[in-house]
Amino acid sequence: MSNARRRFSTVTQINTEGLQAMGKGGGRMETVGEDGIPADYKGNRKFTTSLGHLALYKEDEGIGTQASFISGYTTPGPKERATSEHVKANLGVMLGVYLPTIQHILGVTMFIRLFWVVGMSGVAWTMALLAICCLSTLLTSISLSAVATNGVVESGGAYFIISRNLGAEFGSAVGILFYLANTVAASMYIVGGVEVILMYLWPEMAIGGADALHDTEMFGSLYNNLRLYGTVFLLIQALIVAMGVKFVQLLAPVSLMCVILAIAACIGGGIEKQITMEGMKVCAIDNHLLQSSIVTHPIHKNQTSWFNETVDFCNLCDKSLYLESVFCANVNNDEASAEDDVFCTHYTSKKMTCQLAFPGFNMKTLNDNMWPEYMEKSEVVPGVRGKETAEVVQDESSTFFMLMAIYFPAVTGIFTGTNMSGDLRDPQRSIPVGTIAATLTTSAIYYILAILFGGSITRSVLRDKFGRSIGNTMVVAALSWPHPAVVTVGAFLSTFGAALQCLCSAPRLLQSIAKDDVIPILAPFARVTKNNEPFLGLVLTVIIAECGILLGAVDKIAEVLDFFFLMCYAFVNLIAVLHSVLKSPNWRPRFKYFHWTLSLLGAALCFFIMFASSVPLACIACTATAVIYKYVEWKGAKKEWGDGMRGLALTTAQYSLLKVEDKDPHPKNWRPQVLILLTSQWSKEMIDRRAVSMLNLGAQLKAGRGLAIACAFLKGSVDSQKDKNRARDVKTTLVKDMSSVRLRGFAKTMFYNNHQINGTISGLYQSIGIGGLRPNTILLNWPNEKNPDELVLFAEEIIHGAANDNCLIVTKGITDFPEYSERLTGFIDIWWIVQDGGILMLIAYLLRQHKVWKGCTLRIFAVSEQDSTKSEDMKAGLQKYIYMLRIDAELFIVDLLDMEVSDEVVEKAAEVERKQKEREEMRRSKSGYLNDGFMEDNGKPRQVMMRHSDSARSFSPQPGAHTSINLDETETSFTESLFDDFYRSGTPNEDLEGAMKLNIHKMNTSVRLNRVIRENSPDSQLILLNLPSPPRNRLAFNNSYMTYLDVLTEDLPRVLFIGGSGREVITIDS
């Protein structure tokens, strides 16, 4: 075979839309398996082999296995999958999404409230009301389609979508609200069904008889009957649900068929009434509609239904002695009110007429019903109070937004398809098509019915919520054809089926939330029975549903129900907005007819409906969400679901960092950005209290609201898996310890070994942080002198910190520092030895802002050798300076007296010199010693520069020099000749004798200062001292520098050494 004809591969085109592989056999379609391989393929199912074809991409055996980029993608992880697998998911768009969603959306509210909404708002404003409600659900459906096609939707439906996209906190909060929405919806459906039974099917069942149903007060007999029978029906339906979900599923198609027939009967009735011009009649005095029971009372005392007597009814629409007694009985009584006179006058002066209640669809009626006529409670017509025992009056006041709140539950139910994702053959196609189609269909049905009612029923009858004028018959049922029972029975069955569905789905939703283990209090509800039924969840659902039933009225329950659904819908829209605006890499929805502005409009509409309907209830819903959010955050939501809130946080952080300029801040804006260096002994069996105490101190310094990073040094290598596992455990411990001391910040670990200490520390200081958010303050602990590793680390941390121009804070006696819960009183003493820009005072001030140190008093001891004649002037100048700094502190000037070198000092200095020589000899005798790099390359000690910036706080190094007080420059000064040798390093050209004298002088300073501090601060809670500039010569650091500091702090319990870089200038400016 020639090279030109030789083939090295075969290519198969994949139809991604149909999830089928197109073979070469004449267009034959091959079924594709779950892993993307044809189901009947019997060969090697691996894409790569250990030898040959893709050996280039085969990983070394020593390297941990990584996922191939062509491996299967699964979202979410295995632990997030449903516990039960369906044998076969074969439902399509129609049976799996479209019809169930329509069945859930269309309900009792459409039959018992839509006509009344039209009567109050008019056709035009009802169109606007429906537009707002339907548009909010349509936009939410679009957002839902985008989110649902951006991955696999598991059990939990809407809760799964929200929690996996907004995080555990928001997911739990909105999940609980969605659970409450389903539970309270069950209450509304049950109360609506009871209303249909008692008002329109069997009024004789009412306790107190049919007449008791006329008492429409909140705690009147009508609503008490609804509460009682609602509780009975709730228990019956709970028993049915406890028997299993299969029975509930059997009722769904029956309920849907009855609803469809009822809608068709309404439309048929509008047409039939227009053709025949026959229908039920009503009586009215002028335009005041009368209750039919009053009109029929003289002849049919106990009759409440008269469908077969429409012809004779108009004969009863005439004034009679009985009607006169109803309207004018109290006129002649002494207890007669002004209203009684008005009722009687209207009755006697106006004509009583018989009107056709259902003239059939016509433009005249439509025009008459076009504009709103909102009414207050007990009004018979707008602005006129009616006689409640005789006329048809309103049982509650109405406004546009109140009507919107009542009707909004009629458009909910769009998550039905999402909840059935596990039963769908192709969820990513079925959910968008089915949900949006169902939303558009139901919206069209509502518009058609609203126009039908507005054009087929007179205005006065439309306002008759309970059908009092037509023999307590449902208004929509009286319009229908061929028989009112089609609508009445259909309305009841729709409520019964919908309530069963809610009682079935709500406990399972609660179980999904509890199973995620983000709300500990819900843990018991994760358990199920042997038949996989969440019995405990059902019990809680019944209890909450009973609370909803106790509200009594459908309208009251609907107003509460809105907010649960609206919060859920708003967050689904926000998910889509969040992912789109942040351009998340994993945001690749298959649903293409989506734009984030639509989702933003949907979220805005949801919040608008909430706050327009009821500001108090909206605030309660938002507060409930916030409370659950903070509860989950407080309990520690340890789930990581790759949610969008993390993406939002990252984007916000990026934006903020870019706004912060990467340069030194103005002195007014300086605050400690703390890097806490920990060299503790990390062990699972032992807790090193030094690390916890360091974190405690770091938390107490966070009054400056700066950055905090805790870094633990570990001896090891990044190449060792054992060391990496240990580092991960240490970081976990560190995070827990930071949380326990309430230090909010970041934790990290750093490996080092004996040959990398210098580069490790230097690299850490140079690289840590990002942009303008970099640590400027290093907090480190005095090392354990018996641990050589800690000594070497400490030396490098100090030297490189100084070279990097960081503020250094060194703690001594860290285990004696107070814990978070302690409250100290006493003194915080600042021993001001060198001019440092005021960093000691700033650190002390920040510590005092914390509740641990708040009870302490600041004292400043300025050490000086000024003569007594100038001491008072210096004290006055310093007092003014402290006052202008706005720091409350007591100021003391300390004059050192005895300057003689004692024998003790000479002995200690000689000891330091002897140790120095021993270590030098040891260093020379060992090649490749750990600290070979302590010297410069030329073998000479590194020259040490003063760390205190000349521009910020300069002083003369010559003995006897004095600096002046200049308050305009916020300077304080005092004689520093005494400490020149102590607070600076020696020069490289000093001979041994000069070095010995220098050591004696430094040791003398340490001893003298220690005695003075112990004399003046014997009981201080904390002492702050200037940190002498460290030598860059490591041998000098280990041999003498640490010894001086040890002597300086001898017998002092808590000490902070603070060394400024000169940038931390505390100013008197505002």
Swiss-Prot record:
It is a multi-pass membrane protein. The chain crosses the membrane at residues 92-112, 114-134, 142-162, 174-194, 196-216, 228-248, 251-271, 400-420, 433-453, 473-493, 534-554, 557-577, 600-620, 791-811, 827-847. The keyword tRNA processing does not apply. Keywords: Cell membrane, Chloride, Ion transport, Membrane, Potassium, Potassium transport, Symport, Transmembrane, Transmembrane helix, Transport. Its main location: membrane. GO terms for cellular component: apical plasma membrane; plasma membrane; synapse. GO terms for biological process: cell volume homeostasis; chemical synaptic transmission; chloride ion homeostasis; chloride transmembrane transport; microvillus organization; potassium ion homeostasis; potassium ion import across plasma membrane. It is found in: Cell membrane. Gene3D superfamilies: Amino acid/polyamine transporter I (1.20.1740.10). Signal peptide: none annotated. One of its GO terms (molecular function) is potassium:chloride symporter activity. Changing residue 602 to D: In nj94; defects in thermotaxis. Expressed in the amphid sheath glia and the cephalic sheath glia. Also expressed in the inner labial and outer labial sheath and socket glia and as well as phasmid sheath glia. Pfam families: AA_permease, SLC12. The keyword Transmembrane helix applies. Probable potassium/chloride cotransporter that functions in the amphid sheath glial cells to regulate thermotaxis behavior. By maintaining chloride homeostasis, negatively regulates guanylate cyclase gcy-8 in the thermosensory AFD neurons and thereby controls the microvilli receptive ending morphology of the AFD neurons and thermotaxis. Modulates the temperature-evoked neuronal activity of the AFD neurons such as calcium responses to temperature gradients. Might also play a role in the chemotaxis behavior mediated by the sensory neurons AWA and AWC. This is Potassium/chloride cotransporter 3. The lineage of its organism: Eukaryota, Metazoa, Ecdysozoa, Nematoda, Chromadorea. The gene is kcc-3.
